[in-house]
């Protein structure tokens, strides 16, 4: 894969430039655009993934199915499809906004800062997973309610963005409806 960049955002969340992805994620990360996707199978189970130990931020933690950054000029939906293929080797359908105005700032144990405007989507997997082990060290299809209980009981085991997304009542309701095929 070619060198990835992040789209930097100004105070009004408008694109203001780009920066190489690894240069952007530091102790002083500028605000940038990202996305999160919660991927479900035909049985309504959620794919939770464990971030590779080689990840710069939050290595080894469990998180939602796929996250990433759109490239300059790339629609978020196109970026989600690209990252699902790259990280999980999977095709998706029914891409649906769940929490379009989610944003957060979090600091990982190594001091790396995430500072993102990060729309959240749900989608359905339409093919068998072929996981890229450089991105994902483990994954599991789980019942959404079980995952939400796990997040509540042990939030430290999950990415902060997943915990924050799961704590939003409206997002939880929309994810549950999506899982149930509504």
Curated annotation (Swiss-Prot):
Subcellular localization(s) per the UniProt record: Cytoplasm
Cofactor(s) listed: Mg(2+); Mn(2+)
Chief place of localization: cytoplasm
Binding-site list for Mn(2+): 25, 32, 69, 114, 116
GO term, biological process aspect, one: isoprenoid biosynthetic process
Pfam entry (one): NUDIX
Group of enzyme by EC: isomerase
Cofactor note: Binds 1 Mg(2+) ion per subunit. The magnesium ion binds only when substrate is bound. Binds 1 Mn(2+) ion per subunit.
Protein name: Isopentenyl-diphosphate Delta-isomerase
Organism: Salmonella arizonae (strain ATCC BAA-731 / CDC346-86 / RSK2980)
Encoding gene per record: idi
